[in-house]
A protein has these predicted regions:
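Solvent-exposed, acidic/flexible segments
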Residues: 25, 29, 104, 258, ...
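Short, conserved active-site loops that position catalytic residues or coordinate cofactors/metal ions
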Residues: 41-57, 248-250, 280-294, 430-432
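Membrane-interface segments at or immediately adjacent to transmembrane helices
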Residues: 166-172, 219-286, 296-306
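Short glycine/proline-enriched turns and hinge-like loops at secondary-structure junctions
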Residues: 151-154, 238, 328-332
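Membrane-embedded alpha-helical bundles of multi-pass enzymes
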Residues: 2-232, 437-438, 449-453, 464-466, ...
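Glycine-rich, flexible loop/turn motifs
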Residues: 148-161, 170-172, 253, 347, ...
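Solvent-exposed soluble domains appended to multi-pass membrane proteins
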Residues: 286-548
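Generic structural signal for well-ordered alpha-helices
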Residues: 111, 115, 270-273, 388, ...
Length: 549
């Protein structure tokens, strides 16, 4: 009896230690996943972390951990990573920041759940079937990024491809596949490297192992998506486009809509703008909703903007509010971009934002949630636009079709693509990131503009109220960024950028612009095919052991 009790106690102690080891491993995987996420995306300076971001979770999945343990710790890691990445959102809403982090963490968690199911089963598959299954996992990642873009109005912030925003050599595939292709290459490399490491461990332990075709296929994809396509960026024939003046007034959000501060705000805009007159800008650009009163619908505000354009002796492209009434007398508010010319004044053609921010610019189902009105800074809902609203900007040697995107519209590739299809030669992003403090938000936001430039082979010019202001060429190269003497983007000032373009893309459309999100459909087919191949075969736990012999 005593011996039995001692054995039982020993077993309990061993089980307890084993449990602690599993918990420690799970916590380590969660922490490492969060660290790699934060390092990979701006303002992190280690985009190469995206090549190994999923590997801790993938290697863990090969050990067949308990489902609850696996999903629980990976959710913790993904959630923590997102909290750090969108920490800036707490300036607007703590609840929204925490809730959004949890929601967006669910999408990669679904992918890791699929990997937990697939990874132990890959060993029992023939080479062709195994490669197809791995391609299916990579395709599933793309499908989940697409779903995150569309569900519940969408929050496509920081897809995996955005990690490479300062690595133009890998971005060129976006002109063919959209940013989806970049995400596919990166996650497939994670899968290939993870499987290679598994084989390597098997070789070290048993001095034998098999060829890992998935890893070498990942290298092929990486080469084709980078060096193989980078040649498209060589042999450029660049020509001057314009001298773009950029005004960054850096109006604090707490006073932006305060009527008592209106005169001070206008004086700041005027001084910051006219300080650039000696640099002879061809066109001046102001950020989103820059004026404290509506530009359209307020005669005095319109007159003031027209006066500034005449004093500057140059056209001004500015973000502002448009106010009007419909036939029934109901108020209509638009978040818009206008063109003001020194000779003719405010152009009747303007762009209105098409994708509004829920609970920021309108309240979904307002009649069911009237209490939510306190979260909207302007009393009523904004009305979305429904066209690209191209602005015809007269330059000394040509008339330029300018396509506008407001605030976070540049995170939606379909909007930039539609604007380019309608004839835009230059994409302009007017934004106001002052809502989110001086953290990572502006850098992360700019990363999406880089993707839009490459996808559509159009230069992108950005002006922010407080940063990030600059321009990106058709190949994703960041050509200029407005910074102060301390190299900070967060300041009040302005500059004039010499914009140019590659003549080879004048009037031409990229493959992606012409054909859209075809790669998402391909990824869906791969994901379904891979799932069918895995589900059809029962799991053999001894297959992995046999595969290394």
């Amino acid at each position: 009896m005593a011996a039995s009790a001692r054995v039982s106690g020993h077993d309990r102690g061993r089980d307890s230690r084993s449990r602690l080891i599993r918990l420690g491993l799970g916590a380590s995987i969660a922490g490492l996943t969060a660290v790699l996420m934060v390092a990979a995306f701006p303002p992190g300076r280690f985009p190469e972390a995206a090549y190994i971001l999923a590997i801790p979770g993938l290697l863990w999945s090969r050990r067949r951990p308990e489902w609850r343990l696996f999903l629980g710790f990976l959710f913790l890691g993904l959630f923590t990573g997102w909290v750090v990445l969108i920490w800036w959102l707490h300036h607007v809403t703590w609840v929204g920041m925490i809730g959004m982090s949890g929601v967006v963490a669910l999408f990669p968690l679904v992918w890791f759940a699929a990997a937990r199911f697939a990874m132990p089963r890959l060993a029992e598959l023939e080479v062709a079937t195994r490669i197809t299954a791995v391609l299916g996992l990579a395709g599933l990642w793309v499908v989940l990024e697409w779903a995150r873009m569309h569900l519940f109005s969408g929050f496509p912030w920081l897809p995996l491809a955005a990690s490479q925003w300062e690595r133009p050599i890998l971005l060129q595939s976006a002109a063919f596949t959209g940013f989806w292709g970049i995400s596919f290459i990166l996650i497939f490399f994670n899968l290939g490297l993870a499987l290679y490491l598994v084989r390597l461990v098997g070789f070290v332990r048993r001095r034998n192992g098999r060829f890992c075709p998935e890893f070498y296929l990942a290298l092929v994809f990486l080469f084709l998506g980078s060096f193989g396509l980078y040649r498209t960026a060589t042999g450029q024939k660049r020509e001057p486009l314009m001298r773009a003046g950029v005004t960054q007034p850096y109006i604090p959000q707490v006073i932006k809509w305060d009527p008592s501060e209106a005169r001070s705000i206008l004086d700041t805009i005027y001084r910051t703008t006219l300080n650039l007159k000696a640099l002879e800008p061809t066109v001046m650009f102001w950020p989103e909703a820059v004026t404290p009163l509506a530009v359209l619908g307020n005669a005095s505000m319109q007159g003031w903007v027209e006066t500034v354009s005449r004093d500057l002796d140059a056209p001004i492209v500015l973000g502002g509010i448009a106010f009007s009434e419909d036939d029934g007398g109901a108020e209509l508010w638009h978040n818009s971009v206008f063109l003001v010319k020194p000779d003719t004044g405010l152009s009747p053609v303007f762009y209105s934002k098409r994708h509004l921010v829920p609970f920021g610019e309108y309240i979904p189902l307002r009649r069911f949630f009237p209490w939510a009105a306190k979260f909207v800074p302007i009393g009523g809902d904004f009305t979305p636009g429904d066209t690209s609203g191209l602005l015809s900007v007269n330059l000394p040697e040509r008339t330029l079709s300018l396509g506008s995107l407001i605030c976070y519209e540049d995170v939606y590739p379909a909007l930039a693509r539609r604007t380019t299809l309608d004839g835009a030669a230059l994409l302009y992003v007017a934004t106001n990131n002052a809502w989110y403090g001086e953290g990572a938000a502006a850098y992360q936001h700019a990363a999406h503009s880089v993707l839009r430039a490459v996808e559509n082979r159009r230069p992108v010019l950005r002006t922010g109220n407080g940063g990030w202001s600059g321009w990106i060429d058709e190949y994703g190269l960041i050509r200029n960024v407005l910074v102060n003497d301390e190299e900070s983007i967060y300041f009040r000032g302005g500059s004039v950028f010499e914009l140019d373009r590659d003549r080879r893309w004048i009037g031409r459309l990229s493959f992606y612009t012409r054909h859209g999100d075809w790669f998402v459909l391909l990824s869906f087919v791969l994901a379904v095919t891979g799932a069918v191949l895995l589900v059809r075969r029962p799991y053999d736990p001894l297959a992995e052991v046999r595969s290394t012999k």
